[in-house]
Amino acid sequence: MFENSNDIQLLSVPRDPRRYLVLIRAGSKRRPSFFSEIPQGERQYDLAINYYATPHPDDILRNRAEVVFAGGRSKMHGAKRFFEATGLHNIYEGVLFLDDDIEILFNPDAFFAICDEYSLDLAQPALTPDCIDAMGLTREHPGLKLRTTNWVEVMAPFFRRAFLKEMLHSFDLSISGWGLDLYWGHHLADRWTAGIVDELLMRHTQVSNHETGAFYSYLRSIGVDPYEEMKSILTMIDTNPYIARPIRFVYRTYSFRA
């Protein structure tokens, strides 16, 4: 049941969904993140866990998350199958998609509040400076609250409901995920706003290894070439290269009282 597959198996869904959803694609390892246990107190988000391998024995989310499902071929592929099966993308105001090697260093409600305040349709937290395989655009820029951009990385994207409904069809265009963020960025046009939130940080706890890493070994085993998938999407959007860039800067403010 807990394995990569073309289909998914739903194990639990909420009867009364909260405003937002945090969806984690997870395997058998211990997670380093905020979600090693269920957050205490009031929260405006549900937790969803999508397993591609048997959960770790200490994984509390297996029995305590509001949403549990198994299967899917990768993070966005599984998410598409889940939303097609449940229709919950029509209910949640926004969804944050995470891998299980992402450690978030903030309360998700604070992130959702910033996305709401600045009307971000597509967004991500900034990465800590010690993430050595991160693009410069996605690393924290000290002194900034956020930057609007024309691109958000597939690693941990947030989608507001309207943009999620618009882009859901694309989630299985690339099983590796390569190129999906270019597709989303291309379709922002003048209608949607994307941003990287510098005030709230996340850490990528594992360095991606395209040769020996478990995910890339899995992709080779099913005949998926990430470079070819990205090339296909660049052809699809008739843009090569795609230039990712910041657009507008929102600076942090500081108050002094006497």
Please describe what each predicted stretch is.
Residues 1-60:
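N-proximal low-complexity "stem/linker" segments adjacent to membrane-targeting elements
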Residues 97, 122-126, 193-198:
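A structural signal for short, well-ordered beta-strand segments and their strand-loop junctions
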Residues 104-181, 185-189:
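Conserved catalytic core of nucleotide-sugar-dependent glycosyltransferases
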